[in-house]
Amino acid sequence: MSIYLIRHGKTRANEDHLYCGSTDLPLSPAGLAELGELRYDIHPTRFVTSGMRRTDETLKALFGNVPFTVDARFREVNFGSFEMKSYDMLKDDPAYQAWITGDNEANIPPQGESGVQMTRRVLAAFSELPDGTALICHGGVIAAIMAACFPAEGKHRYQWQPLNGHGYELSGDTYRPIP
């Protein structure tokens, strides 16, 4: 059996290159159209989302009106005061500079959470997923899971982040990109 990790479709924040973790955005029209072009040849027996609009809408666009459960532990990292802002908006902010030039896995954005904190909650939830589950979630969440499951690959967490609407099938100690 397998577990399927699928990143939500594009949102306005993705298109505008904004930090978006805790903001509950819908898919953009372009994101919905792109999902309509994807063809998944997978057969999950269970579906889980983070409960954010963008993940629930992605599930429906890809798999129709299937029953699913919500686990909020699979939500994206909380970017705190950097939420819904771009690099250009933040580049002169000393707190932002400290976050991006230091260890941004351990550093915490003001009113947000660190990558380490997010990874802990995500991996705790991931350990409970049964085989056959399709998890529709977020790029940072998928990247954290993949980095933890495949450390021998030597990739930084961000190198695992799939494109919107894409993801990975995990089967035992192997993986493949999907769709």
Task: Mark where each language-model region is.
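Phosphate-handling substructures
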Residues: 62-121
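Active-site-proximal alpha-helix that buttresses catalytic centers in soluble enzyme cores
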Residues: 3-66
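Conserved histidine-centered catalytic loops in small-molecule metabolism enzymes
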Residues: 42-73, 96-98, 150, 171-179
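Generic beta-sheet signal
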Residues: 3-4, 45, 131-140
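Short beta-strand scaffold positions
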Residues: 49-50, 120, 136-137
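Short active-site segment of divalent metal-dependent hydrolases/proteases
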Residues: 11, 141-142
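Domain-level recognition of soluble alpha/beta enzyme cores
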Residues: 152-178
